[in-house]
Amino acid sequence: MELPPNVQNQLMQFQQLQQQLQMIMYQKQQFETQLKEMEKAVEEMEKSTSDEVFKMAGGILVKRNKDEVKEELSEKMETMKLRVATFEKQEEKMQKRYAELQENLQKVIGQGH
């Protein structure tokens, strides 16, 4: 059965949206993982009694002041949280559009049978 051009177009949009949604979900997951790693690092630093910690810089460990590193990590964590929130909003919008397109396509294709 040959699909009408408008249905083919909707199907193409649906597939593109599906790919975009997967990419957004993957990126969000990456940022969430980085955020958890940073939270774990801050947690470990708080357990430490030393005023200094080692920070990875270009493949080497550099001794740094613990409070400065905690401040840097806190700032990075805030940025990560904002990015995750942005991805969540994008994902939500795409999920809604995806469901609408899926429903539309099911109706149109269902009528053809």
From Swiss-Prot:
Belongs to the prefoldin subunit beta family. It holds the Pfam family Prefoldin_2. Heterohexamer of two alpha and four beta subunits. One of its GO terms (molecular function) is unfolded protein binding. It comes from Methanococcus vannielii (strain ATCC 35089 / DSM 1224 / JCM 13029 / OCM 148 / SB). The gene is pfdB. SUPFAM superfamilies: Prefoldin. Its main location: cytoplasm. Gene3D superfamilies: 1.10.287.370. This is Prefoldin subunit beta. CDD domains: Prefoldin_beta_GimC (cd23162).
